[in-house]
Swiss-Prot record:
Transmembrane portions of the chain: 139-159, 297-317, 383-403, 423-443, 447-467, 486-506, 520-540, 603-623, 804-824, 826-846, 858-878, 894-914, 927-947
Keyword rRNA-binding: no
Localization (cell): Cell projection, Cilium, Flagellum membrane; Endoplasmic reticulum membrane
Record field: compositional bias (Basic and acidic residues): 1-20
Residues listed as glycosylation sites in the UniProt record: N192, N275, N279, N678, N692, N737
InterPro entries: Patched_domain-protein, PTHD_SSD, SSD
GO annotation, cellular component aspect: endoplasmic reticulum; endoplasmic reticulum membrane; membrane; plasma membrane; sperm midpiece
Tissue expression pattern: Expressed in germ cells of the testis (at protein level). Detected in blood lymph, colon, small intestine, ovary, testis, prostate, thymus and spleen with highest levels in testis.
Stated name of the protein: Patched domain-containing protein 3
Domain SSD: residue ranges: 383-540
Length: 954
């Protein structure tokens, strides 16, 4: 942040008040120091040239209302932007003591070390020189960025259209433990979809169709309802896909098989179809012994009521819902393609199937292995209409904010071009990264809405600085003055926002990395275009002012009324030297500031803040972690009711987890088996594990050997009988990995998890199972394909905390480097932490999860919190007012309107996302809305009040 030399403290004999002299006008009150005209029109010295002493004041130095132009050799002097709508940094228009304030550059030269005012001086001189060049050659600076945009825009040719966005790659942690566990399973265990399919033994998700059937009556365990379900099952299996040359893809061709038959979609339904006399009131749950073959029914029935013990479980008295699972071949590439074609055809025809069947007893919802991907990609279409609306609203806001009755100073066209400049930045930034090959993920579609708000803020700063220049000055000199004032401000805010964004690259989520890269690059282009093509357009508009001003010095009654209004509104000649103080700034000075600094107001503000921080902390402990898969689709998607039914009826049981022995062990050793059994018992004692559904080949094998009068403790006996055992128990064939040297390299068993419906429970389950495996004396590993997504629950909080801490530390360092007041830096850090706690806490109240999408917003939150708080704090500590209340009022007068307008413009930029039908876009709006509201509240209410309590220590 650019720094100006602190003004001398008023002594006892000199106590300037924050009151307006009777004879002073509004602009004069904040311009008490003498200002002078520059004499030369030569370009300022280069950016690295040493500053020179100021020239003697010119003949117009006595004019109180004239701003101080920059002369040939005059060093750039910082000045305040009274009504800049975003975070202007210079404060020279504040009331000054009568004694002369030394020049910052002069002080800097006499110091042994270069302080932050030297950095500000270098930046100011650099931009002063750039502004002169833009004013001298506006067409070059206007057309060159347009040509660059046209060239980089060709990168949109590489925008992926038909390529699927890999949800696992982009929305699960990079290098997560589950991915390493999956690689181990794939390297040590095989599966066979064509002959011996087992869903629980697969390391990856198979192609499948899942139908959830809900009965309109209390239970579907009656022959009439089963007959209707069977009719639905027959319609699905009869579905055919027509191919070229008259061939077809039938379900029987692509279905996963167990021996010669397609895997039944529901074991009990299949048993009833084979034997219609099956007594549906004598089924045990969760395991059912059918013809000496145990059938595990977890996940196949929901909304059930159980009775007394029966066989391998309890009597299933009633069941409200049933699941039909149709597994398809996945391993073979050719069959995989055919399976997906069949699934796509099913999705297209499923509504017609339901209409034809006219089901009366059941309701059906559907989901496939392709649904998540297809519906997620479809969400991008929902945001396209609101994208156009956002630009219309921003243009209207910008044009309205820049409207003046004085048509010479009117900047409506300039404001409209400023919005266009932000659009050019989006095209250039996205085009460049698409050329490079950075993946474009759907959540990057949120970025243009954010760029709109930020770009408009920077535009307002430059327009406000232009209004502070002298109409009679040369365009080059006016642009030089504008850049020396405004460009430093937008440079600092751009640096902080980009710095906060680029900390997100450290995230372990690819989606967060891609968003931060795209948004950071686009912010750079937005900044570059603001100081080039937008500045050039403003210079060209300045020439219009000059031409219009030169036309008339006095209004002639003979001229047409349109000509009068165009150049001289209401028939008056514009003030060439006047400054433009916005009425809202006067409101902050005359009404809001004095009201806020009253004692009773301060106590009320403290009370409100205590309530805010308590409720925020409470919310932080109740925020849900992880990305709910149903939120990847739009609200009207068919998968939303599917997940609702699944949550209501099928949440009692979780995934069936592999327990893998990862190294060679002596299974024939009784002590080894005892250690392994002890570990299994520890797993079964876990609150999230059903001890009655454990399945392990070793237990069955030991019983098999003992039943055949064999000694399981003798190595040769143990190893030589394994082939016979596997032929009698083929279910275990894929659970033992035996090498060519007849050694068991690895093996696995299974445990059944229960009651893990919430993200918090999934996180705890994963942590506890892995901890048990680590603590076991036998080398164990736990894995299920769902763990790939469960890992996000453990990683998201760690990632968020790390990114927030790193970004906050970076902001603290930046504030220390650019602000010569350590206490101010502490207040900035306090505000950042307070806003983050508030946003995180209120996410829980607004039902927003802490996931990779919201983590992006929390990172962005840091940059905006810095912008809102740093300038108010700096204006307070650098104020020369004698009392803390007057310091606070002055800070609000100078910067209250910019902070307010910055928040409003950003909210307008993202508010259209509230109408989006997709969670990922609404979440962006919700969190950015909270960031703007809480950030503005800290900048305009909390920080000004709290500073009055501690101002005496400054």
């Amino acid at each position: 942040m650019p720094w100006v030399e602190p003004k001398p403290r008023p002594g006892p004999e000199q106590k300037p008040k924050l009151t307006k002299p009777d004879s002073a006008t509004g602009p004069q009150w904040y311009q008490e120091s003498q200002e002078s005209e520059s004499e030369g029109k030569q370009p300022p010295p280069g950016p690295l040239a040493p500053p020179k002493s100021p020239e003697p004041s010119g003949p117009l130095a006595s004019e109180q209302d004239a701003p101080l132009p920059e002369g040939d050799d005059a060093p750039p002097r910082p000045s305040m932007l009274d009504d800049a709508p975003r975070l202007p940094l210079e404060l020279d228009d504040a009331p000054l003591p009568e004694e002369e304030t030394p020049e910052p550059t002069a002080i800097c030269r006499h110091r042994h070390r270069c302080h932050t005012d030297c950095l500000e001086g270098l930046l100011s001189r650099t931009f002063q020189w750039l502004g002169w060049q833009v004013g001298a050659h506006p067409w070059i600076f206007l057309l060159a960025p347009l040509m660059l945009t046209a060239a980089l825009g060709t990168g949109f040719l590489y925008l992926p259209k038909d390529e699927e966005e890999d949800l696992e790659e982009h929305y699960t942690p990079v290098g997560s433990p589950a991915k390493a566990e999956r690689r181990f399973v794939q390297g040590h265990f095989t599966t066979n979809d064509s002959y011996r399919f087992s869903a629980s033994r697969r390391s990856t998700e198979a192609n499948f169709v899942s139908l959830l059937v809900v009965s309109y009556s209390d239970s579907l365990l009656d022959p009439a309802t089963f007959a209707e379900v069977s009719k639905l099952d027959g319609a699905v299996q009869d579905l055919r896909v027509a191919r070229e040359k008259g061939s077809q893809i039938q379900y029987q061709q692509v279905c996963a098989r167990y021996r010669a038959l397609c895997v039944p979609p529901n074991p009990i339904l299949y048993a009833w179809q084979v034997n219609k006399t099956l007594n549906l009131s004598s089924i045990s749950f969760p395991a059912y012994n059918h013809g000496r073959h145990p059938l595990y029914l977890t996940g196949f029935f929901g909304g059930y009521i159980l009775g007394g013990s029966l066989g391998m479980g309890q009597l299933l008295l009633r069941a409200k819902a049933m699941r039909l699972l149709y597994y398809l071949k996945t391993e073979d590439p050719e069959y995989d393609v055919q399976s997906k074609q069949w699934l796509t055809h099913l999705l297209d025809q499923f509504t017609n199937i339901k209409n034809i069947l006219a089901l009366k007893k059941i309701e059906v919802v559907h989901f496939t292995s392709l649904s998540r991907q297809l519906e997620f990609e479809a969400t991008s279409v929902t945001v396209i209409p609101v994208f156009h609306l956002a630009y219309i609203l921003i243009i209207l806001f910008a044009v309205t904010s820049c409207f003046r009755f004085d048509c010479i100073r009117n900047k409506m066209c300039v404001a409209a071009f400023g919005v266009i400049s932000a659009f050019l930045a989006v095209v250039s930034g996205f085009g460049l990264l698409l050329h490079i090959g950075v993946p474009f993920v759907i959540i990057v579609a949120n970025s243009p809405f954010l760029i709109l708000g930020v770009g408009v803020d920077d535009m307002f700063i430059m327009i406000s600085a232009w209004h502070k220049t002298n109409l009679a000055d040369d365009i080059r000199e006016r642009m030089s003055n504008v850049y020396s004032k405004a460009a430093v401000s937008i440079t600092i805010t751009t640096i902080t926002n980009i710095l906060a964004l680029y900390t997100g690259i450290m995230s372990s989520f690819r989606s967060v990395q891609c968003f931060c890269i795209y948004t950071g690059m686009t912010l750079l282009f937005c900044y570059f275009y603001n100081i080039t093509c937008f500045g050039a357009f403003m210079a060209l508009d300045g020439k219009r002012e000059v031409v219009c001003l030169c036309w008339l010095k006095k209004a002639d009654p003979k001229w047409p009324s349109f000509k009068k209004f165009c150049c001289f509104p209401f028939g008056s000649v514009p003030d060439e030297h006047g400054t433009d103080i916005h009425p809202i700034s006067l409101f902050f000075r005359d009404y809001f500031g004095p009201f806020l600094t009253r004692s009773e107001s301060k106590y009320f503000v403290v009370f409100i803040y205590v309530l805010y921080i308590i409720s925020s902390i409470y919310g932080c402990f109740h925020v849900q972690e992880g990305l709910d898969l149903r939120n990847l689709a739009s609200d009207d998607s068919y998968i939303t009711p599917y997940f609702n039914v699944e949550e209501n009826y099928f949440s009692d049981y979780g995934p069936r987890v592999m327990v893998i022995v990862t190294k060679k062990v002596d299974y024939w050793d009784k002590d080894v088996r005892q250690k392994l059994e002890n570990c299994t018992k520890i797993f079964e004692k876990n609150v999230y594990v059903d001890k009655n559904l454990t399945e392990f080949w070793l237990d069955a094998y030991v019983q098999y050997l003992k039943g055949n009068s064999q000694d399981p403790n003798e190595k040769n006996t143990f190893m030589n009988n394994i082939p016979d055992f596997l032929s009698n128990f083929p279910n275990f064939q894929h659970d033992i990995n035996i090498s060519s040297s007849n050694e068991i390299i690895s093996s696995r068993g299974f445990i059944q998890t229960t009651d893990v419906s919430s993200s918090a429970k999934k996180k705890i389950l994963l942590f506890q199972l892995r901890r048990i495996a680590e603590d076991c004396q036998i080398p164990l590993m736990v894995y299920n394909q769902a763990f790939i997504y469960f890992d996000q629950y453990a990683a998201i909080l760690e990632d968020t905390v790390r990114n927030v801490l790193v970004a906050s530390a970076a902001m603290f360092i930046v504030s220390l480097l650019l602000i010569p007041y350590p206490l101010c830096s502490l207040w900035v850090t306090f505000a950042i932490g307070s806003v983050i706690v508030g946003v995180t806490g209120f996410m829980a109240f607004w039902k927003v999860n802490l996931d990779s999408i919201s983590m992006i917003n929390l990172v962005i939150c840091i940059g905006f919190s810095f912008d809102f708080s740093v300038h108010i704090s700096y204006a307070f500590v650098s104020s020369s007012q004698p009392s803390v209340n007057q310091k606070s009022v002055e800070a609000l007068y100078l910067l209250g309107y910019p902070v307010l307008q910055s928040a409003i413009s950003t909210i307008i930029g993202v508010c259209v996302l509230a109408a989006a039908k997709a969670y990922i876009f609404r979440t962006f709006f919700k969190i950015m809305f909270l960031v703007m509201i809480f950030g503005a509240a800290h900048g305009l209410i909390f920080i000004p009040v709290f500073l009055t309590f501690f101002g005496r220590f400054i």
